[in-house]
Regions:
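Core segments of cupin and vicinal oxygen chelate
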Residues: 1-43
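N-terminal beta-strand motif that seeds the catalytic metal site of vicinal oxygen chelate
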Residues: 1-6, 62-63, 67, 118-128
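Vicinal oxygen chelate
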Residues: 1-2, 30, 50-128
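A generic structural signal for short beta-strands and their flanking turns/coil linkers
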Residues: 25-27, 34, 59-61, 82-84
Length: 128
């Protein structure tokens, strides 16, 4: 990120993450029970590429987290209340197949894609 204060505000205020350790060069967040580290870097001028997944254009530069269905629905409601733009609207992907999941994508202020998903069956998380 090219602005750590903007990152801190966005991840805490929009997503509800809590702060961990921080310096003038990086910030740790509690990202839904996982450590997310945002580092200070010069403004990125790279084009963000996409690939098709189940008919949707997905940012090739993204990361994600698996939530329970209840957590996923609460986060969808929180983001809708904050009028956050979804890059991929909340939906069900791979319906009726192994890996069926509720998913949506958003971007942070630096165009990093974030995917949030909840699987219909947790045994399918890494099935092929």
């Amino acid at each position: 990120a090219s602005n750590l204060n903007l990152s801190k505000n966005w991840y805490c205020s929009i997503l509800g993450c809590s702060l961990g350790r921080q310096t003038v060069e990086w910030i740790d967040f509690n990202f839904f029970g996982h450590q997310l580290v945002v580092h200070l870097v010069p403004a990125n001028e790279e084009k963000v590429f996409t690939n098709r997944v189940d008919g949707e254009k997905v940012s090739s530069r993204h990361f994600g987290v698996i939530l329970t269905h209840n957590e996923w629905k609460k986060l969808v409601n929180r983001l809708q209340e904050k009028n956050l733009k979804f890059t991929i609207q909340p939906q069900t992907r791979f319906s009726g197949k192994a890996g069926e999941q509720s998913t949506f994508f958003i971007e942070d202020p630096f165009e990093n894609g974030l995917e949030f998903k909840a699987f219909q069956n947790d045994d399918d998380i890494f099935s092929v």
